[in-house]
Curated annotation (Swiss-Prot):
NCBIfam families on file: PRK09585.3-2
Coiled coil (residue ranges): none
Any Pfam family the entry gives: AnmK
Any Gene Ontology biological process: peptidoglycan turnover
Keywords: ATP-binding, Carbohydrate metabolism, Kinase, Nucleotide-binding, Transferase
Record protein name field: Anhydro-N-acetylmuramic acid kinase
Disulphide bridges: none
Family, as annotated: Belongs to the anhydro-N-acetylmuramic acid kinase family.
Domain of life: Bacteria
Function: Catalyzes the specific phosphorylation of 1,6-anhydro-N-acetylmuramic acid (anhMurNAc) with the simultaneous cleavage of the 1,6-anhydro ring, generating MurNAc-6-P. Is required for the utilization of anhMurNAc either imported from the medium or derived from its own cell wall murein, and thus plays a role in cell wall recycling.
Keyword ATP-binding: yes
């Protein structure tokens, strides 16, 4: 198959803006080669993030505002795609497809025999019309309709691009939520294990915002200065989510700002650096426990991606707790840690346009492999 250009767009649970990746895809659906040609990170336009936070945190929002946000997020994503394509020196007519994840504002996995439901804002029709490029969006719903969690979806990229014949690998994403993909050496897609381990940056960022009014703990510097409070840590680690076996997924509804406020109240007697260290240790220890409880064995290598890959506290602690596994940032494996998820949605859009399935049933719990996403053709 001739090389194809595709764009992937995403905004994560932190709602801090949009990431875009322009990639070249060659090969077959079973063995694609994906090369990143350009990337772009943009903040949301003024006011849009606040409107999204209001909705994502469960506050009352009129239906008209939800509808307007569905349009406005799409227009912001379209502008991100247009800037990315132009800055990379290409024309929209050269792009085969855009994969737009949109902005998750609610994600409820299946529970107690009730079907799940999920909502990502950013209507692909607006993106297709604004760019003139075939756009695929609304990726998660089809997996849920097939009985799955609707998440995680990125492990298909991990499996196709990062599996190794000789070494067990974990790909550990550290976005707002932490999720792991376990790739057994030489294993097939039915052997992939992937799930959300719990919070990553959501609670750390929330703690820093509540205490200092700053957006996040840059480089983990505050956590590195603090001391972990064992009483708070053990109480927080008793959360039932950490004991629940996969497949499982979570989000801002469970580990969002309301939870950060509760943890801040419970740790208010501690110095700020100790609070941040303790919440950061919650991320680290919940990851370690998930590996020991739910993986066949500890991996030989762990590659970190997402914003938390730059957090010195998290990297150092994972390196110690998961030894002798080698812990490194995913760029050592040829994957930009800040844009892996954007790459994944470019790949998922390409798979959808070729008619190939995009989910891994062993990962999401779906009854079968299905094509993911709604297609909005160009023109």
């Amino acid at each position: 198959m001739d090389p194809t250009l595709a764009v992937g767009l995403i905004s994560g649970t932190s709602l801090d803006g949009m990431d875009g990746a322009l990639v070249e895809i060659a090969g077959s659906a079973q063995q694609p080669a994906v090369t990143t040609l350009a990337t772009l990170a943009l903040p949301y336009p003024a006011g849009l993030r606040g409107r999204l936070l209001h909705l994502a945190e469960g506050k009352p929002v009129p239906v008209a505002e939800v509808s307007a946000l569905h349009r406005d997020v799409a227009l912001a994503f379209a502008d991100c795609a247009l800037q990315l394509i132009e800055q990379a020196g290409f024309r929209c007519g050269q792009i085969a497809c855009i994969g737009s994840h949109g902005q998750t504002v609610h994600h409820q996995p299946p529970a107690d025999n009730a079907a799940g439901h999920t909502l990502q804002l950013g209507d692909g029709a607006w993106i297709a019309e604004r760019t003139g490029v075939t756009t695929v969006g609304n990726f998660r719903t089809r997996d849920m309709a097939a009985g799955g969690q609707g998440a995680p979806l990125v492990p298909i990229l991990d499996y196709l691009l990062l599996r190794d014949a000789r070494r067990d690998r974990c790909i550990q994403n550290l976005g707002g939520i932490a999720n792991v993909t376990y790739l057994r050496a030489g294993g097939g897609p039915e052997e992939v294990i992937a799930f959300d381990t719990g919070p990553a940056n959501l609670l750390i960022d929330g703690t820093v915002q509540i205490a200092l009014g700053e957006p996040f703990d840059r480089g983990g510097s505050l956590a590195l200065q603090g001391t972990v409070d064992r009483d708070c840590l053990e109480r927080w680690l008793a959360d039932p989510y950490f004991r629940r076996p996969p497949p499982k997924s979570t989000g801002r509804e469970y580990f969002g700002y309301a939870r950060a406020r509760r943890l801040a109240e419970e740790s208010a007697h501690l110095p700020v650096a100790d609070r941040v260290a303790t919440v950061s240790e919650l991320t680290v220890r919940s990851i370690e426990r998930a590996y020991r409880d739910f993986l066949p064995r500890l991996p030989d290598e762990v590659f970190l991606c997402g914003g938390g890959a730059r957090n010195g506290y998290i990297r150092a602690r994972l390196g110690r707790l998961l030894a002798p596994a080698r812990v490194a940032v995913s760029d050592e494996a040829g994957i930009d840690p800040d844009f892996k998820e954007a790459m994944a949605f470019a790949l998922l859009a390409w798979l959808r346009c070729t008619g190939a399935p995009g989910n891994l049933p062993a990962v999401t719990g779906a009854g079968r492999a299905v094509p993911l996403g709604d297609v909005h053709p160009a023109g």
